[in-house]
Amino acid sequence: MSRIGKLPIEIPKGVKISYTDSNLQVVGPKGTLSRTIMSGVTIEMTENHISVSRDDDGIKSRSAHGLTRTLINNMVTGVTKGFETALEINGVGYRAELKGDVLNLSLGYSHPINFSLPKGINVEVDKMTKILVKGVDKELVGQTAAKIRDFRGPEPYKGKGVKYADETILRKAGKTGKK
């Protein structure tokens, strides 16, 4: 058995889960998420717990067992607490500004970058150099933060660019010059 897959998922109060024809829908105070569950995995629900088991010991069933449990747990956590990822912008003249549902980034290029936010994602900009990406879907929050970071990733010499708040950049020494 998968160590992660055999752990039960606790359903908090205020969360409703419905499972029909391999479609799982989780409704909570922060929103609604739905996902198609892979074949080879069975979901059993009680009043306040969900358990995931696999149908057989095939390679696909074994690999889907722990993954399915983790995805369902992330859905439950997302609709109750939500997820957030913090980004920092470093560099002279680098800044971010939020206009409606468009994030306007000035990252040292000859043109500003206008990034349209996907549905279900909220962004907060603090002091024009800190970006907080929030949402209920963990995958979408992470993907949106990665797209914003990819516009100008941190460079190793001066550390300029967009980086995750908890990311450390390994700095390189510059040219030493002739002596």
Swiss-Prot record:
One Pfam assignment: Ribosomal_L6
GO molecular function: rRNA binding; structural constituent of ribosome
Membrane-spanning parts: none
GO cellular component: cytosolic large ribosomal subunit
One Gene Ontology term from the biological process aspect of the record: cytoplasmic translation
Highest taxon of source: Bacteria
Subunit structure as annotated in this protein's UniProt entry: Part of the 50S ribosomal subunit.
Family note: Belongs to the universal ribosomal protein uL6 family.
Name of the protein described by the UniProt record: Large ribosomal subunit protein uL6
Organism expressing this protein natively: Geotalea daltonii (strain DSM 22248 / JCM 15807 / FRC-32) (Geobacter daltonii)
Record lineage: Bacteria, Pseudomonadati, Thermodesulfobacteriota, Desulfuromonadia, Geobacterales
This protein's encoding gene: rplF
